[in-house]
From Swiss-Prot:
Domain of life of the organism encoding this protein: Bacteria
MF terms (GO), sorted A to Z: sequence-specific DNA binding
Region of interest (Disordered), residue spans: 51-72
Single Gene Ontology BP annotation: regulation of DNA-templated transcription
Family according to the record: Belongs to the YiiE family.
Lineage, uppermost ranks: Bacteria, Pseudomonadati, Pseudomonadota, Gammaproteobacteria, Enterobacterales
InterPro entries: Arc_rbn_hlx_hlx, CopG
Protein's name in the database: Uncharacterized protein YiiE
Length: 72
């Protein structure tokens, strides 16, 4: 999977905590942040109005589905 670079502004406290976690887990900060973002996006679900894709009113879909619909 191709990866893109994203720049974040984090508090000094968040960086300290992230560094401790990095040392404990023996993985990079990028790996921890990538995992956290992926988990967050998985948990996010939004009600969607009836769309051309045959969804029913109020059906819940994930972020990926909404991104695809937005581009169409």
């Amino acid at each position: 999977m191709a990866m893109n670079t994203v720049f974040l502004h984090l508090s000094e406290e968040a960086i300290k905590r992230l560094n401790k976690l990095r040392g404990w887990r023996k993985v990079s900060r990028s790996a921890i942040l990538r995992e956290a973002v992926e988990q967050y996006l998985e948990r996010q679900q939004f009600p969607v109005r009836k769309a051309k894709g045959g969804r029913q009113k109020g059906e819940v879909v994930g972020v990926d589905d909404q991104c695809k619909e937005h581009k169409e």
